[in-house]
Amino acid sequence: MAFLGVPYGRPYRGLGPELPSATAPAALRAASLAFQPYYWNVDVDFGGDLFAGREVLLADAGDVRLVPGDHTGNLERITTVVRTLLRAGTVPIVLGGDHAVTVPVLQAYAEQTGLCIVQIDAHLDWRDEVDGIREGFSSPMRRASELSSVHAMVQIGLRGAGSGREEEFAAARTWGSVLVPARTVHREGIEWVLDRLPQASAYYVTLDADGIDPGIMPGVNAPAPGGLTYWQVFDLLCGIAHRGQIVGFDLTELAPARDPSGVTVAHAVRILLVLIGALAHAGQFG
C-alpha cells in the first residue's frame, strides 16, 4: 500500500487562485505522527491488532510534482504516477486535493476490468462541465462513468440542495448509478447499503470529506449537515473489504485551514487507519 499526495486545488472562476484542500496531504502526514506510537497497541475498534497479525507494508510515495497553471499536464502527471504504482503491485491511497484528482487517478486503471466505484460524498458530482472545465471537482463521477474499466457505481451520502441539478440526477440514474441519500443511510443502516452494492471484480472507494457530517469533520470545502458518522464509514469500509478486493482509495476535499482545532484532520487520519485495518482483517494483505 502506497500513500500518494496530490496537493491540487484548482477552483472554477470566482473561487480564488487555489482551494484550501491543496494543503491537505501535508496536514495529513503531520497529523499521522500523533498516531504512530500507538499502531501496535490493541485497537479496540477492531477487537485487537489493527493489522490482524499480518505483515502490512506501507510506503509514502511523496507528492505528485505539479506545475501551477498547467491543468491538463497536471492531470497527466497524476495518471502517470498512479499507473506506475499499480504496475508495481501496490494499492494506491491518494491524498487530495480537491475531488478533481479522482478523474486522473481512475484513468490509471485502464487495464482493470469490472471496476465498481463507491463514492462517499454529499454531492453527486455529475456535472458535464463548469466554466468549460470537464475534469473539475464537480465532474469526477460523470468522467468515471465514461471509462471502459468502470461497470458500476454507488454514490452514498447525498444530501442538501447543492448536490446536483435534475439533469445530472437523470444522467446518473440512466447510466445505472445506485444513489443512496444520507437520510436513507441513517434510516436503513449500513447493512442495507452493503446489500445494494453491485458484485464486482474490484472496488475503488472515493471519499469526499464532506460526505461525513460537519459536526465530526468541519474542515472541508463544502460542509453539508446530515452526513455520515465515523461508525457508518467504519462499517462501510469493512463491509466493502469483505465483499471484494479494494484496489484503490482517495480522500479529497479536506480544508485544514478551516478547522484550526485539527479535529477534522485527526478524524481523516483515523479513517485512513480504518481502511488499512479493514483490508488487513479481510485478508487482503499477506
Language-model features and meaning:
Residues 1-286:
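Conserved alpha-helical scaffold segments that buttress catalytic/binding sites
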